[in-house]
Design a protein with these regions (language model features):
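Short, well-ordered amphipathic alpha-helical segments that serve as non-catalytic structural scaffolds
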Residues: 36-51, 74-78, 103-106, 166-173, ...
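Conserved catalytic cysteine-centered active-site region
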Residues: 64-119, 161-165, 230-256, 337-364, ...
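Active-site-proximal alpha-helical scaffold in enzymes
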Residues: 95-125, 168, 174-203, 263-270, ...
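Flexible glycine-/small-residue-enriched beta->alpha junction loops
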Residues: 118-172
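Conserved beta-ketoacyl condensing-enzyme motif
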Residues: 31-98, 102-118, 123-142, 208-222, ...
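N-terminal extracellular/periplasmic Venus flytrap/periplasmic-binding protein-like
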Residues: 20-21, 32-41, 49, 183-274, ...
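Condensing-enzyme catalytic core mediating Claisen C-C bond formation in acyl metabolism
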Residues: 2-35, 233-298, 302, 367-368, ...
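Active-site pocket-lining segment
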Residues: 168-171, 204-207, 284-353
């Protein structure tokens, strides 16, 4: 691709590597692997895949939501552990589920403005390791019981405006958009079936960085998404509502609580050509959207429309979509609102099957999109996701 870039294309920002860990289940294989270690392993592999040296990197921007207990600036920790010189900068971004999408937008902007030429962006999240918090201890708990707060739910999955779980927002969307339980379960089943088919066909192997995990029996190599489950419509139908007594959102038609890391390396196109780097795609542009927090799941439809307007495209120009499946209800709502062909959306399954490590999920869907575009020769792709609090983000990428 890079050898064909001429004129204005040389000012574009291109992707030169896209890697991720396999996604771990809650308290699963990655529970003892810290976000720092996960991110470092994947970053090193991404650098190797790109052909870049650590010294070529100008800055590092990583999304992370559950930062309590991780120490100062997880992005800086991963940068130095990966061998990137200490005279380069790094910072972390928290925009809840949109953390990576904001990170890659900032990385893109830094290159377009000429501040940097090579920027590492990505997301890291170990939801299994999120600590419990006590707000009673700072001032001294003289007597009585102390309340412990689950930081994973409090900081990652709880609507701060309505004081309820993200799952309630999905039930709100289902009710507002007239999406039945049967539709949601059918969508969830398809996600599981597509993900299992992709795994069996080895489609994720190239994008996944194996992680070695030491245990009592020795060293285990974790290299396959472990969250996908065998299920049927009948078994999904037996699940009770998870959030509202009369709701339709269940554990089976929602995304999981997961662990993982993903890294994407961006480069100025002219720099990539000078270094002889292979490129996966060019970043065409971004879109943001916002809505009422209680129906946050519809925001990808707003973000995608804004994205397409920004890049002067229409929906028919997009060959492939990766939409983060926070919940089946909101995913279906977005599909209906945009009138998308389901055959070009999440062709290898989505977060309901693969998992949703919140700060890393935007990167995971873009990594998967880029590799599917490469494999299937799709020219234009779009990745988007909703964000707790009533926001959405989107990115369009193009192969040339």
């Amino acid at each position: 691709m890079i050898n064909q870039l001429k004129g204005k294309d040389m000012n574009e920002v291109v992707v030169v590597a896209a890697k991720r860990s396999a996604v771990g289940s809650f308290l699963g294989s990655l529970k003892s692997v810290g976000a720092r270690e996960m991110g470092t392993v994947v970053l090193k592999d991404a650098l190797k895949a790109s052909g870049l040296e650590p010294s070529d990197v100008d800055s590092v921007i990583l999304g992370n939501v559950l930062s309590a207990g991780l120490g100062q600036n997880i992005a800086r920790q991963i940068q130095l552990d990966a061998g990137i010189p200490n005279d380069r900068n790094a910072f972390s971004v928290n925009m809840v589920c949109g953390s990576f999408m904001k990170a890659i937008q900032l990385a893109h902007d830094a290159i377009m403005l000429g501040r940097d030429e090579v920027v590492v962006c990505g997301g890291v999240e170990n939801m299994s390791a999120a600590p419990y918090l006590s707000f009673d201890m700072r001032d001294g708990k003289r007597m009585g019981n102390a309340n412990m707060i689950d930081s994973m739910i409090h900081d990652g999955l709880w609507d701060a405006f309505n004081d309820y779980h993200m799952g309630i927002t999905a039930d709100n969307v289902a009710q507002a958009c007239h999406i039945s339980r049967e539709e949601q379960d059918a969508f969830a089943l398809q996600s599981q079936l597509k993900a299992r088919a992709a795994i069996n066909a080895g489609k994720f192997q190239e994008e996944i960085t194996p992680i070695e995990i030491a245990n009592k029996k020795g060293v285990v190599v974790f290299k396959e998404d472990e969250y996908p489950r065998e299920t049927t419509l009948e078994s999904l139908a037996k699940l009770k509502p998870a959030f509202k007594k009369d709701g339709s959102v269940t554990a089976g038609n929602s995304s999981g609580i997961n662990d993982g890391a993903s890294i994407i390396i961006l480069c100025n196109a002219q720099k990539a050509q000078k270094l002889g780097l292979k490129t996966m795609a060019a970043i065409k542009g971004f879109g943001l959207g916002a809505c009422s927090p209680d129906i946050m799941g519809i925001c990808p439809s707003i973000a995608i429309r804004n994205n397409l307007k920004n890049v002067k495209m229409n929906l028919n120009d997009i060959n492939l979509f990766e939409l983060n499946e926070a919940f089946a209800a909101q995913s279906i709502a977005v599909l209906k609102e945009l009138e998308l062909n389901p055959n070009i959306v999440n062709v290898n399954g989505g977060a309901i099957a693969i998992g949703h490590p919140i700060g890393a999920s935007g990167a995971r869907i873009l990594v998967t999109l880029l590799h599917e575009m490469k494999r299937s020769a799709y020219s234009v792709g779009c990745a988007s996701l909703c964000v707790g609090g009533g926001q959405g983000l989107s990115v369009v990428v193009e192969q040339k």
